[in-house]
Amino acid sequence: MIRFLGNIEVRADAKGRVFIPATFRKQLQAASEERLIMRKDVFQDCLTLYPESVWNEELNELRSRLNKWNSKHQLIFRQFVSDVEVVTPDSNGRILIPKRYLQICNIRGDIRFIGIDNKIEIWAKERAEQPFMSPEEFGAALEEIMNDENRQDGER
């Protein structure tokens, strides 16, 4: 199982090529993951990079919740899968971020790779603090979640 951790700053070149941080590359290699799936995040102005096996699990989960005979569900599935890029790191460990993604997420030059469990988020450096709470908000939210009385005893 892959678990990406960390917040690593890198620089994209003029063509949108960027080195995948070495710690993340090592994990991908250890898991024999060669292909990555890139898409615009559903909720944030960042890109999400999935190892192919993780993407397939996410896709299977989504598909299992959708009714293929429901037109709204068809639209949701189409939108989710239609704008993805399959990327393979080159021999130097670089990937190319397509221009449309650079524009949509306002990514230029310095960027941040943030490990989020089994996937990686790619942020414009100046927006990389946007998805975080203040330390006080984070502490209160975590306390609320971890002290939730509705959890089963085995989940603590």
From Swiss-Prot:
The keyword Flavoprotein belongs to this UniProt entry's keyword annotation: no
Cellular component terms per the entry's GO annotation: cytoplasm; nucleoid
Presence of the UniProt keyword DNA-binding in the record: yes
Domain of life, source organism: Bacteria
GO process annotations (BP): negative regulation of DNA-templated transcription initiation
GO MF annotation list: DNA-binding transcription factor activity; transcription cis-regulatory region binding
Keyword list, A-Z: Cytoplasm, DNA-binding, Repeat, Transcription, Transcription regulation
Ranges where the SpoVT-AbrB domain occurs: 7-54, 84-127
PROSITE patterns hit by this protein: SPOVT_ABRB (PS51740)
Compartments (UniProt record): Cytoplasm, Nucleoid
Pfam families: MraZ
Chief place where the protein resides: cytoplasm
Assembly and interaction partners: Forms oligomers.
Entry's family note: Belongs to the MraZ family.
Protein name in the entry: Transcriptional regulator MraZ
Organism of derivation: Bacteroides thetaiotaomicron (strain ATCC 29148 / DSM 2079 / JCM 5827 / CCUG 10774 / NCTC 10582 / VPI-5482 / E50)
Top-level taxonomy: Bacteria, Pseudomonadati, Bacteroidota, Bacteroidia, Bacteroidales
Gene coding for it: mraZ
